[in-house]
């Protein structure tokens, strides 16, 4: 279960970083408007991060029989590649992008974009001794909570914290991948 919690935290890092950026763009001083926006961010990101690994899990279940012996190595490659991608993206974030139009279309696009990594990670859930549905629920709830928290942090701190969160998430994915083959 520890692996699921670490995976949830790592996968939530993209959404957390994006939420910090979105929170930093909030112009209104009205707390109720900000709270609504933060909760909406949490719902969009949480649902996307919960559904994508489920899709990956379903695809992985289908394909697992085809390469059962090498499955741990495939999971290793996927998680390490995703981790390296997150590390790279954390260094190439443009922190000057501070004004974003926060429509439902924008939130949906960001939620899908930040959850694509979760689909790849969901593929590896077949290799962990966990209930995949419970794991996806944990991933969704973790992402939702961290996204709301990220929006609040972004409102107070600006965007500088987002890239560090994404880098940490990348390192955790790499560590989980290495653990699967050790």
From Swiss-Prot:
Family statement drawn from the similarity comment of this UniProt entry: Belongs to the MntP (TC 9.B.29) family.
Report the protein's function: Probably functions as a manganese efflux pump.
A GO-annotated cellular component: plasma membrane
- Topology in membrane: Multi-pass membrane protein
Q: Membrane-spanning regions, if any? A: 2-22, 39-59, 64-84, 110-130, 134-154, 158-178
Task: State its location(s).
Answer: Cell inner membrane
Keyword match RNA-binding: no
Q: Which InterPro entries match?
A: ATPase_P-typ_TM_dom_sf, Mntp/YtaF, Put_MntP
* Source species: Psychrobacter cryohalolentis (strain ATCC BAA-1226 / DSM 17306 / VKM B-2378 / K5)
Q: Which Pfam families match?
A: Mntp
Q: Name one GO molecular function term.
A: manganese ion transmembrane transporter activity
The entry's protein name is Putative manganese efflux pump MntP 2
- Is Cell division found in the keyword set? no
């Amino acid at each position: 279960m520890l692996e699921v919690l670490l995976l949830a935290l790592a996968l939530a890092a993209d959404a957390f970083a994006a939420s910090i950026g979105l929170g930093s763009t909030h112009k209104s001083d009205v707390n109720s408007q900000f709270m609504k926006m933060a909760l909406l961010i949490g719902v969009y990101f949480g649902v996307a991060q919960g559904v994508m690994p489920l899709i990956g899990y379903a695809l992985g279940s289908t394909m697992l029989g085809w390469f059962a012996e090498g499955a741990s190595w495939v999971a290793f490659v996927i998680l390490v590649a995703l981790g390296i991608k997150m590390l790279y993206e954390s260094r190439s974030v443009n922190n000057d992008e501070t004004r974003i139009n926060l429509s439902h279309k924008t939130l949906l696009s960001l939620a899908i974009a930040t959850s694509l990594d979760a689909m790849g990670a969901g593929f590896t859930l077949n290799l962990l001794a966990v209930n995949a549905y419970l794991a996806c629920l944990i991933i969704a709830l973790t992402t939702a909570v961290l996204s709301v928290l990220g929006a609040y942090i972004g409102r107070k701190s600006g965007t500088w914290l987002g890239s560090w969160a994404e880098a940490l998430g990348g390192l955790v994915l790499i560590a989980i991948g290495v653990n699967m083959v050790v």
